[in-house]
Curated annotation (Swiss-Prot):
Gene3D superfamilies referenced in this protein's UniProt entry, alphabetically: Translational regulator CsrA (2.60.40.4380)
Family (UniProt): Belongs to the CsrA/RsmA family.
Record-given protein name: Translational regulator CsrA
One GO molecular-function entry: mRNA 5'-UTR binding
Native source organism of the sequence: Thermotoga maritima (strain ATCC 43589 / DSM 3109 / JCM 10099 / NBRC 100826 / MSB8)
Gene that produces this protein: csrA
Keyword Repressor annotated: yes
Example of a GO biological process term: regulation of bacterial-type flagellum assembly
Protein role: A translational regulator that binds mRNA to regulate translation initiation and/or mRNA stability. Usually binds in the 5'-UTR at or near the Shine-Dalgarno sequence preventing ribosome-binding, thus repressing translation. Its main target seems to be the major flagellin gene, while its function is anatagonized by FliW.
One Gene Ontology CC term in the entry: cytosol
Location relative to the cell: Cytoplasm
């Protein structure tokens, strides 16, 4: 981990197109501004972890859940005779 010290108004440049500016320091809180291209997703860590957890839950589908979805599909013929 790279650790840097910055004062209010000072910036950190990441790559060629991301700039982080220290806007305000109050007690234990630091307000920063981030300039980045629109395709770069920027999230607070707690939101990122929550999103990651929700994505993992959504990807864990049981066989019974899949069978239920298939049963509701009008084209579903049931398990094949070879299974």
């Amino acid at each position: 981990m790279l650790v840097l010290t910055r004062r209010v108004g000072e910036k950190i440049v990441i790559g060629e197109d991301i700039v982080i500016t220290v806007l305000k320091i109050e007690g234990n809180s630091v307000k920063i501004g981030i300039e980045a291209p629109k395709h770069v997703k920027i999230l607070r860590e707690e939101l990122y972890e929550e999103l990651k957890s929700e994505n993992i839950k959504a990807s864990e589908v049981s066989k019974d859940d899949l069978k239920g979805v298939l049963r509701n599909d009008k084209g579903y013929k049931g398990p094949s005779a070879s299974s």
